[in-house]
Structure formats: C-alpha cells, structure tokens
Amino acid sequence: MAIVGLGTDIVEIERIQAHVARAGDKLAKRVLTEAELAIYTGHSQPSRYLAKRFAAKEAAAKALGTGIGRGVSFQHIHIGNNEDGAPTIHFTEGALARLQQLKATVGHISIADEKSYAIATVIIESQ
C-alpha cells in the first residue's frame, strides 16, 4: 500500500457558531449529508458537530487533490462513526470517482476538537 493523498484542515468553532447564529442551518444543509443533518439537528452541541464535519470534509477533499469543487462536493463525502465511536469516511459520486482515479482503496480519518478548534486529517491509500 502507498499513500496517495493527505489532507488536513482546522476550523475555528466560534466562526461556525457565528455563521449558524447569522444564517441558521444554511451552512449545515450545504455541508452535511441527510444522515449527518439528522444527527446535527438532535446534537447537544450542533455547531461543534458541524465544525468537525466541515474540517473532515475539507481535509478529505484536500487528500483527493481537488478541494471542494472540481467535481467533488461536501455532499459526496460522508463522515460517520463505527461501533466503537471512531470516525469513518465514505466517498460517493464525484469523490468516489476521484478516489477510483487515484486507484485508492481506503481512506483513514482522524478528527479532534478542543475548546476553540476542530481539526481533521485524512490519509488515502492505494493498493
């Protein structure tokens, strides 16, 4: 296996909170998949959840080498959790096409947050 992509992103949680206060759920609806949006709406800290997902998807898009745009949207990247609570990443549509173009087989993700920031790193491996 070889690493074919690496991406990292950091988000100031307060910036997301301010955006939500100003524009409501507009950003959440643009960034989150339907399943993620369902979690967001019931989450005890929705702005923190959104900041972590935003950072994760930006990191994934950087690892794909496209960024958001150029055929890859936030909606093409789903961030979930396995049964132990560890984050998982799933690619669809344009993100999946780019993953296949890279001949990649797996994506690894790490997400962390502290008082003011959310950070995510994504590694993409090929066979």
From Swiss-Prot:
Its cofactor is Mg(2+). Coiled coil: none annotated. It catalyses: apo-[ACP] + CoA = holo-[ACP] + adenosine 3',5'-bisphosphate + H(+). The keyword Transcription regulation does not apply. GO terms for molecular function: holo-[acyl-carrier-protein] synthase activity; magnesium ion binding. Its main location: cytoplasm. Its EC number is 2.7.8.7. Signal peptide: none annotated. GO terms for cellular component: cytoplasm. Keywords: Cytoplasm, Fatty acid biosynthesis, Fatty acid metabolism, Lipid biosynthesis, Lipid metabolism, Magnesium, Metal-binding, Transferase. It holds the Pfam family ACPS. It is an enzyme of class 2 (transferase). It is found in: Cytoplasm. GO terms for biological process: fatty acid biosynthetic process. Disulfide bonds: none annotated. Transfers the 4'-phosphopantetheine moiety from coenzyme A to a Ser of acyl-carrier-protein. HAMAP family: AcpS. Belongs to the P-Pant transferase superfamily. AcpS family. This is Holo-[acyl-carrier-protein] synthase. It comes from Shewanella baltica (strain OS223). The lineage of its organism: Bacteria, Pseudomonadati, Pseudomonadota, Gammaproteobacteria, Alteromonadales. The gene is acpS.
